[in-house]
Amino acid sequence: MEIFWILLIPFLGTMLGAGTVFLMKNKIDKKIEKLLLGFASGVMIAASIWSLIQPSINMAEEQGKVAWVPASIGFMLGIVFLLILDSLIPHLHLKSDKPEGIQSKLKKTTMMVLAVTLHNIPEGMAVGVTFAGAIIGNAGITIAGAMALAIGIAIQNFPEGAIISMPLRSEGMSKSKAFFYGTLSGIVEPIGAIITILLTSSVVPILPYLLSFAAGAMIYVVVEELIPESQAGEHSNIGTIGVAIGFVIMMILDVALG
């Protein structure tokens, strides 16, 4: 039960971020948005390395496998998985009028929420598979280390929640409705985490693959969406600074608590 509440921490980050719609103006300043996008990227990159890929390598070594094989295969499968989802699920990215995925008649609002929801899937998997490793007691993953990842994801979810709810508000949606949709986009994280824990507890031999799989999926989101959006237009250096800050904070969290 205690772990269940910890799994809700990332979702809480999304909810608090979406809640900024009640406190701020209808639009986020472009410089702040770039900083937040860069920050989220930095957190996810650091989490992928220290909380997922490194434990994947360690666990593979403990299992007597060639350490780089599970990490490499799982990472590439994670990239391919998100690539397939990206091409199948109808969604619309922020600041874009061109929907991606299979053609549909879904509302613009729904497709915007689906875009963020799609990117939250690997984050939920990452938290779930890390807790599974901690529960099993392999790869040097501790509950504290898994909690560090959950906190890190929650921190980067805060700007994501704001970045989805604020544009919805600026398009005329009520604050309460914008908050609801912003929060809804993060619900897949605890669900994905719980499902991943239930699955990985019975498939210990492939846990190194699952750890690196989650890392690959997260890096896909960073490279495909977050970094390009943070670098578009003027003041791209602000996004770069955000990446550095997010990376260092997540690294400190993982080393201090892990």
Residue spans of the language-model regions?
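Intrinsically disordered, metal-sensing/regulatory segments
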Residues: 1-258
